[in-house]
């Protein structure tokens, strides 16, 4: 009788455990629309133009598009730019912006179109705030180092121009591989 009772309890425990395990693996009937991710630390700010901390960069990379981006294979593809050209000497990059690119508020409401002047203003803001990320472009963009170090206070001498609302142009000091 003890063996039979022991077998019965073992079998009942096994069935119960399997049931719990299978129910935990099942699909929920309502799919969550929230993506959760744990970052190693909180960002001190979301001002990606003024700071270059990993916590900020990781979050902002999911919120803000650049002119170009990498596809799943690492190839450069358009993002905010629909097309771009590089001069033969490798010093001038001209980007044509998508007409449908928009800025949105934190509530998700359309705010304004993205324009070429936004890129000029953004670089000037980063330079004026002495952004921690300027080291990435300071020696590449023509005139930027002189502006940052105070050799000139005229930002129009920096190699970034809005040619029209949809076209932004960067002039470099020397050709870059990236």
Predicted regions and their residues:
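Aromatic- and charge-enriched surface segment that lines or borders ligand/interaction sites
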Residues: 82-133
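Bacterial Sec-dependent N-terminal signal peptides
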Residues: 1-10
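Short, well-ordered beta-strand elements
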Residues: 31-46, 82, 92-96, 119-122, ...
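Bacterial signal peptide processing site
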Residues: 26-28
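C-terminal motif of bacterial Sec signal peptides marking the signal peptidase cleavage site
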Residues: 21-24
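Surface-exposed binding/hinge segments that line
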Residues: 118, 127-128, 132-178
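Second-shell loop/turn segments in exported
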Residues: 49-52, 101-110, 156-159
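N-terminal lobe/hinge region of extracytoplasmic solute-binding protein
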Residues: 39-88
């Amino acid at each position: 009788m003890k063996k039979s009772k022991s077998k019965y309890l073992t079998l009942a425990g096994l069935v119960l455990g399997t049931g719990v395990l299978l129910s935990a693996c099942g699909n929920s009937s309502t799919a969550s629309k929230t993506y959760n991710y744990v970052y190693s630390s909180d960002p001190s700010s979301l001002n990606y133009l003024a700071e270059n901390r990993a916590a900020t960069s990781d979050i902002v990379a999911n919120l803000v598009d650049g002119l170009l981006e990498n596809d799943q294979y690492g190839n450069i593809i358009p993002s905010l730019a629909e097309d771009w050209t590089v001069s033969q000497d490798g010093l001038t990059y001209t980007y044509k912006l998508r007409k449908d690119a928009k800025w949105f508020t934190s509530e998700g409401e359309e705010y304004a179109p993205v324009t070429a002047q936004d890129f000029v203003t953004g670089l000037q803001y980063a330079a004026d705030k002495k952004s921690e990320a300027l080291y990435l472009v300071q020696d590449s963009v023509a005139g930027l180092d002189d502006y940052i170090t105070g050799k000139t206070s005229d930002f129009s001498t920096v190699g970034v121009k809005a040619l029209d609302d949809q076209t932004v142009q960067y002039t470099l000091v020397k050709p870059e591989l990236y």
